[in-house]
Structures are given as C-alpha cells and as structure tokens.
Amino acid sequence: MDYEDLKKRVWDLLAQNIESNYRVAVVVVGHPGSGKSTMAQRLKRDLNQEFQSHLKARRGGLRISAGIAAESLDETVPVASGALVEEARRGFFAHVEDPGFKPHKFYDGDGTAVIFGRGGLPNSVRIASEALDPASSVNIAEVVPMDGFHLSRAHLDHFADAAAAHKRRGAPWTFDSNNYLQLCKLLAATCKWKPAKRPKGETLMETICDTFAQCPVISYPGFDHAAKDPVRDQHVLTGFTRVLIFDGLYLLYDQENWAHIYHSLASTGAVLVVNVTASEETRETRVATRHFAAGLVGSIEEGVRKFRENDLLNAKLIEEHTLGGVPTLILSND
C-alpha cells in the first residue's frame, strides 16, 4: 500500500461511518525511525487541506447542532480528593512507577475538568465546554501522539533506578500509559456519538459540513524536543474534529495499559490500523540524525550508539509483544 491509497482508505472509512460515528480512528504504528509520526502529520495536513479547499468553493455556512455536554464524557473518571490534588500540584512523584494507578480528575475554577495519571499534571488531559466558532480554521483531522505522555525528566528522577529510567527513556515503562489509555477511552466514546440526522449530502464533504456538533473541547499534551519534556494542552480537539490519527510506538503493545488501547478504539467499529515500516539501516540513520539535531548527543556516531542501546531495544520489544489478530495495513517508508 502507498500513501495515496492510505489517504483514500481514510476518506472511505469516514464515508462508511458518517451516519453512525461522529469520529473515526486511524492508528499509526511503527518502529522508531520508521517515519510513522511524519506520516501521521502528513495525513492530517492533507485531509485538512482537501476539506478546506471544499469549504472555499462551496456556498452557505456550516450547520452546527447541539451536542454532548462535557460532564457526560468524564463521568466515569473518579474525582480526586483534596489531598490527591495537592499532591498532583506538588509534582505527583510517589506514583511514577505504578501502571495500576487509576486516573483521577479535579475541576479548575472555570469548571474545566483536569484528568491526571501517574505522570501528574505534565501528562494531564483537559475537558472544557466551548462553543464552536465557524469563523475559525476548520480542521477535521487531528493527531493524537503518544509522545506527549513521556514522563517528565523530573518524574524519571524519582524512579527507584533513576539512571536506568533516563537511559531507557522511550521504553514502555517511561510513559504515563495510564493517562494515555484514559485519553483513548474518552476519544473512543466521542467516536461513538451519533451525528445529527440530516438528508445525506451529494458528497461526503457536504455531509460533513451539515453534521458538525457542539462537543467538549479536549486538550492533551505534546512533546517539546528542545525542552526534552511534555507540554500541557499543546493539542486541542473541537467539534470540528472528525478524524483522529493516533500515533505511537506502543499502540499495539500487548503489555500493561498499552494492551487495552487498540481494543478501546476497535470498540467504536470505525478504526483503521496502519504499520509504517522501514529497514533497520534507514531507521538507524533517521534516529541518529534526529538525536543529534535535538541535542541529545554530540555527534551522529553517538546518535547511532544511542539508537542501538535504546531505540533498537524498544523495536525488539514491539516485535516480541504485539497484539495478535489485528487487521493491519502495511506502508513501506524506506
């Protein structure tokens, strides 16, 4: 399969589910250096550009119906005690090695729900009520990257073996898998929302334009490679978002919290999985160059060594522990 075929399949997925699912999910996986994140961003850009080209050419405004209240989305997330909230505000380091910690929420002064897992506030998710603005940029596709759920360096400092945690940063246990899974569950619920019933448009684009709804605004962290840490609220989903592109190394990993991500998304009945592949030589060159550009190493040679001592180990973990029975498309990216 090539990239253009992937893009067509995503449009087809949306068309096939436009009357039953408010959103559809695309899961992009691949080894470090395969180019999965670049592919996810390219897909987001192209889907949005094609939709925006349609908007410029059409006459008439968008139809926006009443939607779902924010409170209904997080109702199954337990409310944190005052002591737990205070602990979160102070850093929340005591739970950093607990993959069984259940995410909790608290409410800011403006009523916004903040959901946090074992990584504390740096990896938190925010849910708010905010009216859609038809005059704003209408992006129907957004990426949901795993990268924003890297545990912060301050949290890695509190591991029993902090040196190993820093050296193996990027391994499954150095992420807030608790809260990334919680985010995936929340977003899977939004995929199952039923779009407003309207006469079907002549084209998929017209049907999309007629079935937008007011939805909770969901913010989640990204990752700043220069600062080497997660950034709160870097990514935002609104009611305009109809395609969710999940991007990450461990989205089909069959251990601890990671093992439940695919099943949560598959429960929507509207999911597509693509594995982006590349040769080990290509991946090594890409990752070594990236490490050097990010200032993580002092030379390309050091970048190669870091790849072999960390990233390659993570790739082998994936090969040994991938969920079975998942229909997966293969996209070669050498």
From Swiss-Prot:
GO terms for molecular function: ATP binding; ATP hydrolysis activity; kinase activity. Keywords: ATP-binding, Kinase, Nucleotide-binding, Transferase. ATP binds at residues 30-38. Its EC number is 2.7.1.-. SUPFAM superfamilies: P-loop containing nucleoside triphosphate hydrolases. It is an enzyme of class 2 (transferase). One of its GO terms (cellular component) is cytoplasm. ATP-dependent kinase that could be involved in endoplasmic reticulum membrane assembly. Belongs to the YFH7 family. This is ATP-dependent kinase YFH7.
